[in-house]
Structure formats: structure tokens, C-alpha cells
Amino acid sequence: MSHFPTLHILILVIANLQIQCFAFVSQSRGFCATGPPTESLKAEYRRLSALGSQSYNPVDSESRAAITPIVIDTWFHIITGEAGTELISDEMIADQLSYLQNAYWNATISYRLQGVTRSANDTWARNEDEMAMKTVLRRGSYRTLNVYFHTDLQASPNAGARAFDIVRRELGVSQQQPTSMLGFCTLPDPSINASSPPSTYIKDGCNVLAETMPGGSLAHYNRGGTAIHEIGHWNGLLHTFEGESCSSDNEGDFIADTPQQSKPTEGCPAQKDSCPELPGFDAIHNFMDYSSDECYDSFTPDQVSRMRSMWFAMRDGK
């Protein structure tokens, strides 16, 4: 008897499993490749934590009015392949900026768009030759936010995103094969000062997959939440699950009012508690978790205080 039908069925089953794995991965924001904080940055987090949370209620209008507004000069760089120059519309750019303003409004942080550049370059669209790209495109000083929206953002084989190994393991992807990701961003660097030459911070900024912009094609991640998440890193925030441990030795994200969390969130569950022996549920609605866009809605008061403290300590005047 021929074994062809059995082999054919097996191939279909394997193909279906691969599709399911891709679907599983697409429900997880495991593609943020922002690296861990340096020891000097950890020391700054500890210093700020020791000072305690500022008396600030982000919902209280009087509290908001009493503090100095932070206005961040911002550049958006739209980078497409040569055959996809129409993929990112002006409406998508405007909607992303609007969401950015709304997400940080309670922190009294706003973003003053200085301009938008558009580049059609297949290499840059994949984030290859990043140094050359940013040397040409980057604008402003260390206090200026530059966001690069790539239509085909890729991770190098050495990138540090948590989900890359999961993807490769499940799908049998070669370690040499580049993997798509949602974004990454630089954390503040304590070594940068007002006299630092631009060459020392040329890579500063956020790289974001353009499909995650409002109206993009990536289901569950096309409301603009990835840019909010990545810019949170630029403002000095870590993942809510930093350290991925429930251990008392884990300093986590150095934020007092985010419950300890050992695993990133996938999708938008009704509730999740990855450290059940510790107080609080996982912050599934927090912009610094890995939840899907429909789940995102807030930063905590201590995260707000941390971003503001980091701005004045690390970026203002530089």
C-alpha cells in the first residue's frame, strides 16, 4: 500500500502547526529588542528609587498644572523599500502622533513634531547599515527624540529580543536568518553630557515596525502602541517583567507601584498573575508590558515620576 496519503497528511499537519506557531507569536509583543540597562543606569534607578516617589497624581489636574511641562522635540523618519513608498500615509503619521500625545498627557509630557523625513531605501527599510542611516537622518541633540518607522524592520542574529529564540525553536528558523520584530529603543545613557559629541549618541532613538502604526496591517498591534512602548524606554522605563523572576533578589523595573511580574503578557487576558505569592496582579494594561494594543491604556504614577526624573537628569539641556 502506498504511503503517500499518510505522508501528505503529515506534511499538512506540520504546516498547520507552523501556521499556529506564527499565530501564537503574532499575539505576543515578544519582539521588543531593547536591551537590559547598564550598571550605571541601574545605579541611577536605585538612586531615584531611594528618593521615593514624588507627590504627583497624573489624574489630578491641579497636580499636573503645578509641575513643569516637558516638551520633547521630535522627528519621525519614514523608511520604506523602493517599491513601497506609499505604504505609510500622512494620516497614519498624524494618528500616531495623536496617540503619542494622548498616551503621555497625564505625565505632562508632550511631543513637538519638528518634521517628517521620508526615505525609500531597501537596505534601511530592513534596518541594515543602521549607523549610516542614522548618520544621514538623525536630527537634533541628545534631548531630541528620533523615531524611525521601518516597513521591514529586521533583527540581526545577535539581537537580544526575548522571543527570537522562541520563534527559532518552534519553527526551526536558522540562527543566521533575520527575524522581524516590532521595535527597539535606546535607554538613557548616564555617560552622555552637554559636551558629548553627536557621534557618541548617533544611534539614540527608537526603531519601530511601520505596520504597528495606526491603520497598519499587523492585527492586534496596529493602533500605535508599539511606538508608545518603545518611547517609554527612551524616557527611561523598563519592562514591567524586567528580570522575569518572582525572586526577592529581582529588582525588576525599579518602579514601586508596578507589581512584580515574571512573564510578559501575551494578547489581552482578563487577568494574569505570574507571581501569585506576591501582592498584585500583572500590569496587563501597562504600556511597558507586552500586551496587544487593545489592552494598553496607562502608565502608573511612579512610572510617570520616573520618566520626568529621568528627563531632567539624563536628557534636558543635552
From Swiss-Prot:
Q: Which GO terms describe its biological process?
A: proteolysis
Covalent S-S links between cysteines: 268-295
Q: Which residues bind Zn(2+)?
A: 229, 233
The molecular function GO annotations come to: metal ion binding; metallopeptidase activity
Enzyme active site: 230
Task: Give the EC number(s) listed in the UniProt record.
Answer: 3.4.24.-
Keywords, in A-Z order: Disulfide bond, Glycoprotein, Hydrolase, Metal-binding, Metalloprotease, Protease, Secreted, Signal, Zinc
Superkingdom of this entry's organism?
Eukaryota
Q: Name one GO cellular component term.
A: extracellular region
Record localization: Secreted
List the carbohydrate attachment sites.
106, 121, 193
Signal peptide positions (record)? 1-23
> Which Gene3D superfamilies does UniProt cross-reference here?
Collagenase (Catalytic Domain)
Q: What is its main location?
A: secreted
Tell me the protein family, please.
Answer: Belongs to the peptidase M43B family.
Which PANTHER family has this protein been placed in?
Answer: METALLOPROTEASE MEP1 (AFU_ORTHOLOGUE AFUA_1G07730)-RELATED (PTHR47466:SF1), PTHR47466
What is the name attached to this protein's record? Extracellular metalloprotease AO090012001025
